[in-house]
From Swiss-Prot:
It is found in: Cell membrane; Endomembrane system. This is Leucyl-cystinyl aminopeptidase. Belongs to the peptidase M1 family. A motif (Dileucine internalization motif) lies at residues 53-54, 76-77. The record marks Y549 as: Transition state stabilizer. It is a single-pass type II membrane protein. It comes from the Eukaryota.
């Protein structure tokens, strides 16, 4: 293992000379504050801005930045003339001015040519200018109010490609694939053959399908009426990742055909498609492994196919492997046959009808533990040395599978269900039908090092992926615009099932926290409806965000709470039965609900107000005698009138639930539907207070006008437990969000949380810590150290009793243990009580034992963070990182390492993860987010992202969740106009596709909101905090 030394690494000067060092109002000049910033510019050598860090899989011969930009533009435009870019560039660079500076006199012939060129150029410009609002895009030129007026694409051989759209035509559909693969894990290449059975739905001559990165050696075609194979021409159009097979005869409606393609390709070195992994086992031996990740658009890189979710078909898969390897695919193994080369060919049974993105196969050394569940063999796989960490996953899967089969009243349709821990995997997990793939830390559980939070994570992710076997696999969205039908349902069922089966885990606390954070994102103007039109690969990747997952789940929770659990269950059972093995749209779901509710409620009309518009409502409530006056408007985090005026038409159908002091809370809850801008609810008696949005089951924020907030604050101080812990957390969230936009004074928010001295539940305390930590971070990053210290002191006084009651053990219920973890992390982060002393004592004992002494798992991260503050502690943690067999423990060490105040170490961590040798690249997003939360790491994280942007988008697809996370994690704490300008300027100099990414627009907006928040509240904080 490579060791770390500070003198090994020189930080680039531009990472020191950050714009944060420029003086501006309310900003500390950090260059003059060595105690706040551990590096002086003169201590480091200059590293040229153009220097490159090699990324695993990119190799040494990388394009320079200009060439990368040029090639990116070529791909974006999709025009054949861009293929000549290098030639154009070479000829241009051949021009040099005469040494003597003189100009030669042009000949008459040259003048004539020049005049001709000018006339042609002027003519072209006039034609373009006179075109009626023509916009050139990846698809071509779209005129206003017209569709499909596209530039005819040119195939790689110079011929016209017969299809110009990103979406495939529907004249031909696949019915069955026979796929044979022979991967070589030494050379990281593979040979493949795919035979596709086709049916013509319309007369056509061309077969358009997806393929990318394949060296196609043979294409043959055969009709059902003729058993003779014919070699056919193939055209390739890489910009849409499509190929066209020109059939030797017209394909007739209703007739069947067979297409066979033989090809070879590289095993990918990214995290997409059929990709390779190299890892080191416990004996320090290098091992090769190959796995797949096809969602959303990568099946086409493993085999030519109709790579859209609506094109469902069956699959027969054969894989040739070494004898010591195991091969897995979606279906049970049918046979294993030795080959002449001394290898083994495994054939798997024909699959059920499914989408291409759900196809999966894995080759490598694995062991498994299995259990039969009503005829389905459930197996959990891991690399051999980690097989002892699969017991929890197997037990959890068995319980969840039985629950889902009973709840949905549909049996799991396959004979086997495999769950595999992949040594290097970007996504958290993937729901491939019958072959679920996971990161090791989201499937494996080590009793000695995994905390209660780790246990909840593994349990929830298994629940999520199992729910997909029905929502997504059995019933699939037609196109990626309705991704929320897959992810929203799986996320909802994740929390619902865990709450039913593992009630002691209190998963509702996590769901509540997820809803709070999702609403912060959804309130932004850069948000989007969860059902949104998408076309390009970047737009599709961007749909995999917290809105598709958690807003989708939140809307289903709201609907279940409004209709009742019985009606909700009946409707989804009907939905699954009616659309099994089909591809559907949102309307199909709402039609199932309407069928169950009859004429009592138009669910489709109600829910479209939530799925087809972005954002959510702010409901203002006013008590007036025995009346509740209600008014709805869109919630905006900004008070800027120009933004609010543009969205005055928003209207939601809002389930209004409420409790009051006039009734017993556990017995009384009233619900009505607010489907207009304002309405009145008549109460049976006059009340002192009202709490709207009971248990925060509705997806909206509530403002209590006039004395409404004061009445609730008084009640919390008298007796907070008349409200549930969900409602108390909901009030804390709502009042801080409203204070942020100026609806209520910030001091009122702090008055509300004064009751926390008497709070014993996790959800309200963790929400208060989250809200106050946001304020602390903004103050700290601007250098307001005295003010941020006074804020910590105030919060500490509220929670002092709870902190002093904590023990450094793993005792108590899961909720109590998570509260202990949160409180002690807060106390140690700010050196409160004797927290640092206790953590240091535990760390020193652990270090003295060479890492063999057990630590309480729930406080392990806090102990490691305190230990990492010293040079000796940091280096010891780093030395232990690679030798640890538990991914849960490694993640805790990595978070501690990335929390250092030493910029050299932080930069080295990010660089090492990008390289992928010592720290896997899958961890880079976690490292950047952690560094970005620190002071002064937030400056370093952004500079690192800027310096390595091209490498990042090569490794992680543009628009992917990882890129979204990296952009947000490196910019979300900026709150100055200087930094806003810097971030804007950087992305404006990237491609148009990059600039238009929602995560980029969100970054601009978040910084602007941070600036507004500080302008609105800094003076107030200074006066009374």
């Amino acid at each position: 293992m490579e060791t770390f030394t500070n003198d090994r690494l020189q930080l680039p000067r531009n990472m020191i000379e950050n714009s944060m060092f420029e003086e501006e109002p309310d900003v500390v000049d950090l260059a003059k504050e060595p105690c706040l910033h551990p590096l002086e510019p003169d201590e480091v050598e200059y590293e040229p801005r153009g220097s490159r860090l090699l990324v695993r899989g990119l190799g040494e011969h990388e394009m320079d930045e200009d060439e990368e930009d040029y090639e990116s533009s070529a791909k974006l435009l999709g025009m054949s003339f861009m293929n000549r870019s290098s030639g154009l560039r070479n000829s241009a660079t051949g021009y040099r001015q005469s040494p003597d500076g003189t100009c030669s006199v042009p000949s008459a012939r040259t003048l004539v040519i020049c005049v001709f060129v000018i006339v042609v150029a002027v003519s072209v410009i006039m034609v373009i200018y006179l075109l009626p609002r023509c916009t050139f895009t990846k698809e071509g030129c779209h005129k206003t109010n017209q569709s499909a007026e596209l530039i005819q694409p040119i195939a790689t051989n110079g011929k016209v490609f017969p299809w110009a759209q990103i979406r495939l035509p529907t004249a031909i559909i696949p019915q069955r694939y026979e796929l044979s693969l022979h991967p070589n894990l030494t050379s990281m290449t593979f040979r493949g053959s795919v035979t596709i059975s086709l049916q013509a739905l319309q007369d056509t001559r061309d077969i358009i399908l997806h393929s990318t990165g394949h060296n196609i050696s043979s294409v043959t075609f055969m009709s059902a009426v003729s058993s003779q194979e014919k070699q056919v021409e193939i055209l390739e159009y890489p910009y849409h990742e499509q190929i066209a097979v020109v059939a030797p005869e017209s394909l007739l409606t209703g007739h069947n055909y067979t297409l066979k393609i033989e090809y070879s390709a590289n095993i990918s070195n990214s995290y997409y498609g059929f990709y390779g992994i190299t890892y080191t086992d416990k004996s320090n031996e290098k091992k090769n492994f190959a796995a797949t990740q096809f969602e959303p658009l990568a099946a086409r890189s493993a085999f030519p196919c109709f790579d859209e979710p609506a094109f469902k078909a069956t699959f027969i898969i054969k894989i040739t492997r070494d004898e010591h390897h195991t091969a897995l695919s979606n279906m049970p193994k049918k046979s294993s046959v030795p080959t002449e080369e001394g290898l083994i060919q495994d054939e798997f049974s024909e699959s059920v009808k499914m989408s291409t993105y759900l196809v999966a196969f894995i080759v490598g050394e694995m062991r498994n533990l299995s259990q039969d569940v009503n005829g389905t063999l459930v197996s959990v796989y891991a690399v051999p040395e980690k097989i002892d960490q699969v017991y929890h996953a197997l037990d959890t899967t068995v319980k969840l599978l039985e629950f889902y089969q009973n709840y949905f009243e549909i049996q799991y349709p396959l004979k086997k269900l495999d769950l595999v821990a992949i040594p290097d995997f970007e996504a958290g997990a993937m729901e491939n039908w019958g072959l679920l793939t996971f990161r090791e830390e989201t499937l494996l559980y080590d009793n000695a090092t995994s905390s209660v939070a780790d246990r909840k994570l593994v349990t929830k992710i298994i629940a999520h992926e199992l729910a997909h076997q029905w929502f997504g696999n059995l019933v699939t969205m037609q196109w990626w615009n309705d991704l929320w039908l897959n992810e929203g349902f799986a996320t909802f069922m994740e929390y619902f099932s865990v709450e039913k089966i593992f009630k002691e885990l209190n998963s509702y606390e996590d769901f509540l926290d997820a809803r709070f954070k999702t609403m912060r994102k959804d309130s932004l103007n850069s948000s989007h409806p969860i059902s949104s039109s998408v076309q390009s690969s970047e737009q599709i990747e961007e749909m995999f965000d917290s809105l598709s997952y958690f807003k989708g789940a939140s809307l289903l929770l709201m609907l279940k709470s409004y209709l009742s659990e019985d009606v909700f269950q009946h409707a989804i059972i009907l939905y699954l039965h009616n659309h099994s093995y089909a591809a559907i749209q949102s309307d199909d779901l709402w039609d199932s609900f309407n069928e169950v509710t009859g004429k009592t409620l138009d669910v489709k009309k109600m829910m479209k107000t939530w799925t087809l518009q972005k954002g959510f409502p702010l409901v203002t409530v006013q008590r007036k005698g025995t009346e509740l006056l209600l008014q709805q408007e869109r919630f905006f985090p900004s008070m800027q009138p120009e933004i609010q005026d543009s969205d005055t038409s928003h209207l939601w159908h809002i389930p209004i639930s409420y409790v009051t002091d006039g009734r017993n809370y556990s017995e009384y809850r009233s619900v009505s539907l607010l489907d207009k801008k304002s309405d009145v609810i008549n109460l049976t008696e006059q009340v002192q207070w009202v709490k709207v949005n009971t248990n925060m089951t509705g997806y909206y924020i509530v403002h209590y006008a006039h004395d409404g907030w004061a009445a609730l604050i008084n009640q919390l101080k008298r007796n907070p437990y008349v409200l549930s812990d969900k409602d108390r957390a909901n009030l804390i969230n709502n009042i801080f969000e409203l204070a942020g936009l100026g609806k209520v004074p910030l001091q009122m928010a702090f008055d509300l949380i004064d009751y926390l001295r008497n709070e014993t539940h996790t959800a309200p305390i963790t929400e208060a810590l989250f809200q106050t930590d946001l304020i602390y971070n903004l103050l700290e990053k601007l250098g307001h150290m005295d003010l941020s210290s006074r804020l910590v002191t105030r919060v500490h006084k509220l929670l002092q009793n709870q902190i002093q009651q904590q023990t450094w053990t793993d005792e108590g219920t899961p909720s109590m243990r998570e509260l202990r973890s949160a409180l002690l992390e807060f106390a140690c982060a700010h050196s409160l009580e004797n927290c640092t002393t206790m953590a240091t004592k535990l760390f020193d004992g652990w270090m003295a034992s060479n890492g063999t002494q057990s630590l309480p798992t729930d406080v392990m991260t806090t102990v490691f963070k305190v230990g990492a503050r010293t040079e000796k502690g940091w280096l010891f943690l780093f030395s232990m990182y690679s030798s640890m067999g538990s991914e849960a423990e490694k993640d805790k060490i990595l978070e501690a390492l990335a929390s250092s105040a030493d910029a050299h170490k932080l930069y080295w961590l990010m660089k090492s993860s990008l390289d992928g040798d010592i720290i896997r690249t899958q961890k880079l997003s976690l490292i950047i987010r952690t560094v970005g939360r620190q002071f002064p790491g937030h400056l370093l994280a952004w500079d690192f992202v800027k310096e390595n942007w091209n490498k990042l988008v090569h490794k992680f697809h543009l628009g992917s969740y990882t890129i979204q996370s990296i952009v947000a994690g490196s910019t979300h704490l900026f709150s100055t106009k200087t930094h806003l300008s810097e971030v804007q300027e950087f992305f404006e100099n990237q491609s148009e596709a990059t600039l238009q990414l929602r995560c980029v627009q969100e970054a601009f907006e978040v910084i602007e909101l941070n600036i507004q928040w500080m302008a609105r509240n800094l003076k107030t904080l200074t006066l009374w905090l």
